[in-house]
């Protein structure tokens, strides 16, 4: 199973995004390799962008939507707490990475920041 990050979904959905081609190719590759999931956190982040729920559901058809568990929330909070405040990043990124880490899944993302905070997480990037 591969958990796809919001950054990849955003680039894939937006044909004018500078990473659109890379994200699209990466998604095609992982869809051929494994089952693909997105977090409910990604749904929340995408809802801010003004898409309708119906359009979003159609775009993500075939992807498994996973909920945040208590274990995911705990792990996200523990890692976030270790991050120096001057480098704080949005907590949603930590929820999504915690979900992948807790399940032992690979994580497809365009966001290469703060990878070292997740030593047991296998990151996948489009080339």
How would you label these PLM feature ranges?
Residues 39, 46, 105-109:
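Short, hydrophobic beta-strand segments that form beta-sheet elements in well-ordered domains
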Residues 1, 97-127:
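Acidic, PIN/NYN-like endoribonuclease modules and their adjacent C-terminal/linker elements
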Residues 2, 35-37, 62-67, 106:
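Short loop->beta-strand "edge-of-pocket" segments that line small-molecule binding or catalytic clefts
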Residues 8, 42, 72, 95-96, ...:
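Alpha-helix capping/helix-boundary segments
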Residues 24, 43, 53-56, 73-76, ...:
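A general structural signal for well-ordered alpha-helical segments in protein cores
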Residues 65-110:
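Active-site neighborhoods of divalent-metal-dependent phosphate/nucleic-acid chemistry enzymes
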Residues 5-7, 38-39, 89-90, 111-112, ...:
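Histidine- and aromatic-rich ligand-binding microenvironments
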Residues 1-37, 47-58:
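Short, well-structured N-terminal submotif of metal-dependent ribonuclease cores
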């Amino acid at each position: 199973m591969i958990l796809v990050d919001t950054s990849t979904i955003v680039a894939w959905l937006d044909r004018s995004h500078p990473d659109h081609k890379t994200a699209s190719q990466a998604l095609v590759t992982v869809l051929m390799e494994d089952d693909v999931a997105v977090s409910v956190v990604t749904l929340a982040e995408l809802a801010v962008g003004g898409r309708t729920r119906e359009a979003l559901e159609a775009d993500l058809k075939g992807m498994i939507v996973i909920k945040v568990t208590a274990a995911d929330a705990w792990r996200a909070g523990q890692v976030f707490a270790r991050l120096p405040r001057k480098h704080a990043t949005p907590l949603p990124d930590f929820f999504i990475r915690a979900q992948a880490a807790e399940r032992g899944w690979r994580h497809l993302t365009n966001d290469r920041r703060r990878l070292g905070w997740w030593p047991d997480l296998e990151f996948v990037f489009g080339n």
